[in-house]
Amino acid sequence: MHTRSRTHRQAVALCAALAASLFTIASPVFSENAVLLIGPVTPTEISGFAGTSFTLGMPQGAHGVYGLWSVERDDKPCYIASMTEDVNKYGDDSSAIKNLCGANPTSNEMKVEFGNVEFAQRTFVRALRVCMNNDNTRVKGLQIRGGEIDGNGNVSDLRAKYAESSDSSSSSGKSMLADLNAPIGLRRNCDNWKKWVECPQGRIATAITAHFGPESDPASLTGIALQCRMVSGTKS
């Protein structure tokens, strides 16, 4: 089990060169059994709505997406980042960011990730859905589902896990029974959830495609798709 930084990758974004040098010196390996990401990139459909698209991350690379991070300005989700980690090296992290917020201050951070002590190493995003505001112009919620990679390259979906007791008076769009294995982030004007989009069996997300709508000053995130690759074990 492991704990990733709860401040997320602000440090990675600000100190990328230093972090890269440290990871090169000593990046702990997940296990003795390395795995590979193979084959072509398979994109999912969009959860939410299409717009001007930006790919965040390296779909053909060796990193898997383990979380997403979004920030707003003036109630508009103008910033989105994917959090990724090498599938064989715990701690070899990186972030890909699309920031359309401009120079003005931002607020209202929203983050979903497989980064708590409750999740095993090599747990990556396999499915995602977004929640929209009431006129379907801005993403106001994120939820992810994941899969855990074993030493043979098999990807096992995380089973639903519910707390023993739930608060039936939950607000802001949360279900009475929240799946603890499907991290969720909500803003107060989350109005309606869009469809789940999911990587094909045996695949994990290696990048995301973020869609921004025609709103300006700043533009708002309207949808997200996953870019997926197959996981395979290596021969001894």
Per-segment meaning from a language model:
Residues F30-S236:
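Lectin-type carbohydrate-recognition ectodomains
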Residues A13-I25:
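Bacterial N-terminal signal peptides
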Residues H2-A16:
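Bacterial N-terminal signal peptides that target proteins for export
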Residues R6, Q10, S27-P28, E164:
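Intrinsically disordered, low-complexity repeat segments enriched in small/polar residues
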